Amino acid sequence: RIGGRLWLKYKRRPFHTGISAVAALALTSLLAVGIYHAKRPSADGRLLMWKIDSRVLLRHPLWGVGPGNFAGAFGREQAAYFAEEERPRQEQLVAGCPESGFNEFLQFGAETGIIGFVLLLSLTGTAVVGAIRRRNPFGYGLFGAAVFACFSYPWSVLPLRLLFVVLLAAACTPRNAPHRGLLRNLPLLLLPVAGAACWPGLYDRYAVRVEAQRQWREVRLWMHSERYDYLVEDGERLYGTLSEDFRFLYDYGYALHKTGDYRRSNVVLQQGMQLSSDPMFHNIAAKNYEALGAYDEAERALRQAHAMIPHRLYPLYLLARLYAATGRSEEARTTARRALNLKLKVESVQTREMQEELQKLLHEPTVQTQPESCNE
């Protein structure tokens, strides 16, 4: 109907309508460019994430990477992207390790494959268009929720995810649907009953997980006192409950590393790599490999960590020291120079200390001391 009205207006006053359309398009373009330049780093970061999201989807087109495995696949794909060729400096600086894809449709497609991606887009698009044509106000609500989902991660919040489902169902329901008998409405009536029946089991699992997270937060305080043996003891007890929590897996794997259980640490860290795009999992795994004498595996892990987020100094720092410790002096110097020439996104006391160590490494490539920890 809106299109028909615009067409009639164009037929009556074609020149005036054409000028108005061009002016509106130009104004919209200028506004978009202005917003982009006002928030350019954020916009470039979103564009890079959408690019990596799409690559994950295309690399796993049939069944996707599976629900819950998106972040790990994102980190691996971003590493492959930066390892393929020298990328623009701006892209390297905005690279990060997000927990979500900042586009729910692309993330859903990456987790479920192209079939799930097309089904979700088709269902949402059909519901929006149909509801707006029927003048169903829920169509506009669903459209707003879909636009929001294209630029953020609302489905990571359970109430917003449920809201999208409710809007989708309401938009698909005709406003003047005929009254149906009780028997025909029986499936809809049984739906909340089934939900109520499932609720106790779901709630119990959720409550157990929340309690385990609370206990781990208390135990984690011992990390500041370097009592990693306490973390290992409780980590083993809570591992079964929190095995899908990447933050727990990193803390537990790091505690195992600090207590010298390098093989067990790598098992836990490998599991965390499937759930997270944080390169610190690879950095600690590399230190475990080095302690076990597996220098080739340590080198591969550090190269992977650097490729995941190229503007971080820590992986190159560890790699230079690995080369120095294994007698590869020239490679140590080359890597140290590369690290010192790196344009850092964030500078800190830790990065300055590492740069000082790298300067010494250029003249003393066999330095053996290593930092205890580093967030960079």
What is each PLM-predicted segment?
Residues 216-217, 247-251, 280-285, 314-318, ...:
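Alpha-solenoid helical repeat scaffolds
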Residues 31-48, 192-225:
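Hydrophobic alpha-helical transmembrane segments in integral membrane proteins
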Residues 14-34, 181-206:
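Internal/C-terminal transmembrane anchor helices
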Residues 1-5, 23-24, 120-123, 135-184:
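Transmembrane alpha-helices of multi-pass inner-membrane enzymes
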Residues 6, 10-18, 125-140, 261, ...:
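Membrane-interface helix-loop-helix junctions at transmembrane boundaries of multi-pass membrane enzymes
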Residues 67-110:
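Interfacial juxtamembrane loops and adjacent helix segments
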Residues 243-244, 276-277, 310, 344:
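Short coil turns that delineate tetratricopeptide repeat
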